Design a protein with these regions (language model features):
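Short, mixed-charge low-complexity intrinsically disordered segments
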Residues: 13, 29-45
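N-terminal acidic leader/helix
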Residues: 1-19, 23-30
Length: 45
C-alpha cells in the first residue's frame, strides 16, 4: 500500500510514496500551514 497527500481543491499530489500512514499524517501535521487543503489518500499497489 502507498499513501499520498493531495490538495483536495486542486486535486494535485502534494507528496507521495509514503510507506506508512503515520508518516503521511505527520507530513500533513507539520506542513499543514503550507498545504491547508491537504488530505491523505491510500493507493493500492
Amino acid at each position: 500500500m502507498c499513501f499520498m497527500v493531495i490538495d483536495v481543491v486542486t486535486d494535485e499530489i502534494v507528496e507521495s510514496n509514503f510507506e506508512y500512514k503515520h508518516h503521511a499524517e505527520l507530513f500533513i501535521e507539520v506542513h499543514g500551514k503550507d498545504y491547508p487543503n491537504a488530505e491523505l489518500i491510500v493507493e493500492s499497489a
